[in-house]
Regions:
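DNA major-groove recognition helix of helix-turn-helix/homeodomain DNA-binding modules
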Residues: 50-65
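Alpha-helical residues within the helix-turn-helix
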Residues: 16, 27, 57
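Residue-level preference for short helical/loop micro-motifs built around acidic side chains
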Residues: 9, 24-27, 65
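Residue-level detection of the helix-turn-helix DNA-binding "recognition helix"
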Residues: 12, 16, 30, 41
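A short, Lys/Arg-rich alpha-helix, primarily the initiator
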Residues: 1-17
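Key DNA-contacting residues within the recognition helix of helix-turn-helix
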Residues: 12, 37-38, 67
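Short alpha-helical DNA-recognition segment
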Residues: 20-38
Length: 68
């Protein structure tokens, strides 16, 4: 059975690691605050590639790194 990747949890951990609030990270990444909160709380389980690209760029990592 394949392990399900929790993208929202990965993003939340990365954001907390760099010490940014959801609001501050939303501004930094260019992703709407409401979208970010929905991703982190798994309301949005599969964000678009464009959203993932913005988030990855703000962290300075690849999209693939967010999926690990």
């Amino acid at each position: 059975m394949a392990t399900e990747i929790n993208i929202g949890e990965n993003i939340k951990k990365q954001r907390a690691r760099i010490g940014l609030s959801q609001e501050d990270f939303a501004k930094k990444s260019g992703v709407k605050y409401t979208t970010l909160t929905k991703i982190e709380s798994n309301v949005i389980r599969k964000p678009s590639v464009m959203i993932m690209s913005k988030i990855a760029k703000a962290f300075g990592v690849s999209i693939e790194d967010l999926l690990k």
